[in-house]
Amino acid sequence: MDIAVIGSNMVDLITYTNQMPKEGETLEAPAFKIGCGGKGANQAVAAAKLNSKVLMLTKVGDDIFADNTIRNLESWGINTTYVEKVPCTSSGVAPIFVNANSSNSILIIKGANKFLSPEDIDRAAEDLKKCQLIVLQLEVQLETVYHAIEFGKKHGIEVLLNPAPALRELDMSYACKCDFFVPNETELEILTGMPVDTYDHIRAAARSLVDKGLNNIIVTMGEKGALWMTRDQEVHVPAFRVNAVDTSGAGDAFIGCFAHYYVQSGDVEAAMKKAVLFAAFSVTGKGTQSSYPSIEQFNEYLSLNE
């Protein structure tokens, strides 16, 4: 295995709307879509579509969504040995609202994701030890995330933490044990309490976390691209301009693609450049996983735009 994704899966309930209703108001929305999502599953699918060998640890509910989620993961070649159903529990769901500017707002109901435990990681230990990178998010219990970080460090496996959704109670001492810490602008603002309205503000906020001990921070910044910072260097990868249709899952697209190319090459900057292009491709289509390109589509896209 190349990559282990330990985290969430969700059923995306996507509403496309020109405006959000006020309290007590009913509005008609022009479109609705159901898809497979969740930050963990999105990142796993993005990497798998690029032909990474991916192992997924997650929990699904005891409902109509569960089998579809498992089939979807398997359809992309993801190892689902440790995707388990939780009896008498709903699957995680994510109502997503996409506005006229193609920006999105998301609510999550964790459902079965809450039951992914440190013990699940221990049960998968022998297979996890074969992976080169562990990818984590914060849509599961923090104790599970912390245990996964410790597992990676104990066994010499690199760890990437995507602190999404941002939780102020995140113990940054664990984040500092990770090889990569990958927030977006909003998450960076919440975690630091610092403004992120300009590029210089983002740099300052990122630097504040590096000064606290982070090894590598990569901030995804949408139309501003991505920023990689360590104690000794700083690299800005500009965004590739496209006509965005739906930005849902773009950050996950970046992380899945980055994970794939980093594991292949060990070159952070080169992996970032490809991940920025992969994320740009993803926002030109509707949905999350459904908007991610296959390896063939992405190679063609790279040949035209690199």
Swiss-Prot record:
Asked if the Swiss-Prot or TrEMBL record annotates the protein with the keyword Cytoplasm, the reply is yes
Quick one: which residues bind K(+)? D246, S248, S282, G285, G287, S291
GO BP, one example?
A: D-ribose metabolic process
In the UniProt record, the signal sequence range is none
Which chain positions carry the site (Important for substrate specificity)? M10
Instruction: Quickly give the catalysed reaction.
Output: 2-deoxy-D-ribose + ATP = 2-deoxy-D-ribose 5-phosphate + ADP + H(+)
Co-factor(s): Mg(2+)
Query: Anything known on activity regulation?
Result: Activity is stimulated by certain monovalent cations, including NH(4+), Cs(+), Rb(+) and K(+). Inhibited by Na(+) and Li(+).
UniProt enzyme class: transferase
> Does the keyword Kinase belong to this entry?
yes
Q: Which residues does the annotation say bind substrate?
A: M10, V11, D12, G38, K39, G40, A41, N42, E139, D252
How does the activity vary with pH?
Optimum pH is 6.8-7.2.
GO MF assignments = ATP binding; metal ion binding; ribokinase activity
Annotated binding of ATP, by residue: N184, T220, M221, G222, E223, K224, G225, G251, D252
Q: Beyond the main fields, what else does the record say?
A: Located in the deoQKPX locus, involved in 2-deoxy-D-ribose utilization. This locus is absent in E.coli K12.
**Job of this protein:** Catalyzes the ATP-dependent phosphorylation of 2-deoxy-D-ribose to 2-deoxy-D-ribose 5-phosphate (dRib-5P), allowing the use of deoxyribose as the sole carbon source. Can also use D-ribose and 2-deoxy-D-ribitol, with lower efficiency. Several ribo- and deoxyribonucleotides can replace ATP as phosphoryl donor.
Report what the protein is called. Deoxyribokinase
Source organism = Salmonella typhimurium (strain LT2 / SGSC1412 / ATCC 700720)
